[in-house]
């Protein structure tokens, strides 16, 4: 009987380890160049390439799961996936709910974009994605916050006149401004927010978080992380 119980215990542990070696990475799939869905219907972008390399270095099999931004932390906590890699800035408020790895991008500025340079940023209507560091910042100003579920909707709100400007990560806004043929411009000063972007894990998964944290460090040490930052975010983006 003891041998049977021991065999069952060993099998259970083996199954647990096997399950832990398949990691479900949760991302939004709607925030280029960090993450987006390509023409083949696959997750693509900076974080797809980064995540695949981190899984390789951590010796784990990974699969990608997409989830709307406004429920991305609750659905991590409830077990829909095992980690978030979705352009999520490290903030004290989020650290109360999840544990982060070290950052895989340095703190990057946020910026305002609008249809003209004479926008009232302090008293106007400013669009931002729900649950972001940008939406939290707007509430500390005199502006009226207009929140949307996706980043594309925040830009559309400016284009159709619902909002005077949008506040978002500058890396996200740069290609939109550059491709607008002058219709959209940056307004005001860049705003440093957050502590850089990291992977988020359930507080009950410290071992998994540690493996990915170590993998991020190896990419910093050998320069491959900087190479990915330049490739996807541009030469002017902060790097390590």
Regions found by a protein language model. Give the residues of each.
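Extended ligand-binding regions for polar small-molecule ligands
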Residues: 48-57, 116-125, 129-133, 196-235
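Short helix-initiation/N-cap motifs at beta->coil->alpha
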Residues: 48, 64-74, 130-131, 146-160, ...
């Amino acid at each position: 009987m003891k041998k049977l119980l021991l065999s069952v215990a060993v099998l259970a542990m083996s199954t647990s380890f096997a399950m832990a070696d398949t990691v479900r990475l949760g991302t939004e799939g709607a925030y280029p160049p960090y993450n987006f869905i390509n023409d083949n219907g696959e997750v693509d972008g900076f974080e797809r390439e980064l995540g695949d390399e981190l899984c390789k270095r951590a010796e784990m099999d990974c699969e990608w799961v997409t989830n709307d931004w406004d429920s991305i932390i609750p659905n991590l906590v409830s077990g829909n996936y095992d980690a978030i890699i979705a352009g999520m800035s490290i903030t004290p408020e989020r650290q109360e709910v999840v544990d982060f790895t070290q950052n895989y991008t340095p703190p990057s500025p946020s910026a305002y974009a609008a249809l003209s340079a004479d926008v009232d940023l302090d008293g106007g209507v400013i669009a931002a994605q729900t649950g972001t560091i940008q939406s939290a910042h707007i509430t500390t100003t005199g502006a009226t916050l207009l929140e949307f579920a996706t980043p594309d909707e925040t830009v559309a709100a400016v284009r159709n006149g619902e909002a005077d400007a949008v506040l978002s990560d500058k890396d996200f806004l740069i290609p939109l401004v550059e491709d607008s043929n002058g219709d959209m411009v940056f307004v005001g000063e860049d705003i440093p927010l957050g502590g850089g972007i990291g992977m988020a894990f359930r507080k009950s998964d410290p071992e998994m978080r540690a493996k990915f944290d170590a993998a991020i460090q190896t990419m910093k040490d050998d320069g491959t992380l900087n190479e990915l930052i330049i490739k996807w975010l541009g030469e002017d983006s902060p790097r390590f």
